[in-house]
């Protein structure tokens, strides 16, 4: 289990459901495995980006990337539909493209200590950004921007 200060706002939401004994119903309603969301809630597993996308209208995506005690900007977003995460259509991807166009992909990666190969794989669509990648880019791109279209 996580230390109390390491809990994100998204985990706190799941822990609240556990306390009220409503997590099983929540999992049935949103088509998730109880064991899976339980493990995410206690911090044993990180939430995959696809899970954050599927729950975006229930738990704001930024809630997964900021720990309790950190302020979370719950930005407004369009009520887009769809169950499949198409990150190349997201605001976050567009912002990453504009940053890379201005600085160059290798320069951006070098300046901020990012792995160039991982950045290239995301830019070319060969690999989706993981939870940890989205966390590492959060100083440049708001995490919720990866989960909503413009």
Each model region followed by its residue ranges:
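Short, basic-rich loop-to-helix N-cap that marks the start of a DNA-contacting helix
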Residues: 44-56, 126-138
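Short amphipathic alpha-helical segments that mediate assembly, nucleic-acid/protein binding
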Residues: 7-11, 23, 48, 52, ...
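Short C-terminal boundary/hinge segments that cap the last helix of small helical domains
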Residues: 59-80, 141-150
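Recognition helix of helix-turn-helix/homeodomain-like DNA-binding domains
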Residues: 31-47, 114-129
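Residues within the helices of the helix-turn-helix
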Residues: 24-25, 53, 106-107
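A short, Lys/Arg-rich alpha-helix, primarily the initiator
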Residues: 1-23, 29, 74-103, 111
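Key DNA-contacting residues within the recognition helix of helix-turn-helix
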Residues: 38-39, 53, 66, 120-121, ...
């Amino acid at each position: 289990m996580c230390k109390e200060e390491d809990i994100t706002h998204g985990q706190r939401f799941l822990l609240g459901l556990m306390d009220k004994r409503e997590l099983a119903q929540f999992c049935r309603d949103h088509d998730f495995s109880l064991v899976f969301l339980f493990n995410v809630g206690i911090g044993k597993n990180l939430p995959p980006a696809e899970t954050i996308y599927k729950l975006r209208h229930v738990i704001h995506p930024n809630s997964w990337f900021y720990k309790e005690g950190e302020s979370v900007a719950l930005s407004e977003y369009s009520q887009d539909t769809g169950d499949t995460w198409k990150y190349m259509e997201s605001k976050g991807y567009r912002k990453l493209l504009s940053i890379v166009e201005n600085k160059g992909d290798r320069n951006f990666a070098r300046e901020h200590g990012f792995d160039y190969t991982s950045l290239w794989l995301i830019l070319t669509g060969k690999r989706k950004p993981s939870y940890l990648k989205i966390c590492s880019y959060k100083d440049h791109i708001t995490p919720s921007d990866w989960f909503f279209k413009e």
